[in-house]
């Protein structure tokens, strides 16, 4: 793609409206489905945007080319977390604002621990960062599938495209920023996308990611990298927030990023580390390669 070379994008203009329209078109394309669908709504910026756009199109009848309201089916949104987790509170606000039928799933730390063996089996890794994020999604997918929903939209990919991770604040210049987004995108299929796909597919649920839609990527990655940068105290993904600030509650549109596993509840990762350190001895780790000769921990 032409945008893989910084020289081809460094002088490009920045059109916020074009970005807005491109993402709406991407979500509309991803909604093409002959099975019941829903949206993953964590309460963060990315999933809130995809959910708001999905609701916009799901609320209209296709047969009338979007001119008449659709009375059925209603769009269902899903959020998971420990009780009183930050994500659950934020997701509730978004669902109320956009009008989805919202399902709030609570899980306990013990339920997460009980699912660990199955989660590791399905995601095929014991990397702690991947496991801690996969477990809530695995538990959520079970509930989604039990309701007969077979496809969900997710917000994966936005952080890689727009430099949403906090370390992007330290990018020394636009070229370094752009090249890091390219690096993150090139590795995405090995980590976040694979993790989400395996967690959902374990229960027969398909996940779709509008932020990684090919046509949308061409628009988003051709933006001048300077417009995506977040130096100093500027909040990450500012251009994306500006594009959809009218579609979301203000406190959501300008909410700072949290990791999914932190957003579902801070106690989850702390307990996971504690249980692991108590269950596995230093001697067992030293002999791990003998017991697990293929890809030892």
Predicted regions and their residues:
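ATP-dependent adenylate-handling active sites, centered on carboxylate activation for C-N bond formation
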Residues: 2-248, 262-275, 285-288, 294
């Amino acid at each position: 793609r032409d945008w893989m070379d910084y020289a081809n994008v460094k002088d490009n203009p920045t059109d916020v409206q074009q970005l807005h329209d491109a993402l709406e078109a991407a979500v509309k394309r991803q909604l093409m489905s002959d099975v019941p669908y829903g949206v993953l709504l964590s309460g963060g910026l990315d999933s809130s945007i995809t959910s708001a756009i999905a609701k916009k199109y799901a609320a209209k009848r296709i047969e009338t080319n979007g001119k008449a309201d659709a009375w059925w089916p209603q769009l269902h949104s899903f959020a998971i977390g420990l009780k009183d987790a930050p994500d659950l509170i934020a997701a509730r606000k978004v669902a109320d604002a956009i009008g989805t039928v919202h399902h709030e799933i609570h899980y306990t730390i013990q339920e997460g621990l009980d699912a660990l063996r199955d989660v590791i089996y399905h995601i095929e890794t014991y990397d702690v960062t991947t496991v801690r994020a996969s477990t809530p999604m695995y538990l959520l997918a079970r509930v989604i599938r039990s309701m007969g929903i077979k496809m969900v939209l997710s917000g994966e990919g936005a952080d890689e495209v727009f430099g949403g991770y906090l370390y992007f604040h330290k990018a020394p210049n636009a070229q370094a920023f752009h090249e890091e987004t390219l690096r993150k995108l090139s590795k995405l299929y090995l980590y976040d996308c694979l993790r989400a796909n395996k967690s959902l597919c374990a229960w027969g649920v398909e996940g779709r990611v509008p932020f990684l839609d090919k046509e949308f990527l061409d628009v988003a990655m051709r933006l001048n990298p300077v417009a995506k940068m977040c130096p100093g105290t500027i909040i990450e993904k500012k251009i994306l927030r500006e594009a959809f600030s009218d579609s979301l509650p203000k406190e959501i549109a300008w909410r700072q990023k949290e990791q999914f596993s932190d957003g579902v509840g801070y106690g989850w990762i702390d307990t996971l580390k504690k249980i692991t350190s108590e269950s596995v001895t230093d001697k067992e780790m030293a002999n791990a390669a003998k017991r697990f000769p293929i890809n030892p921990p």
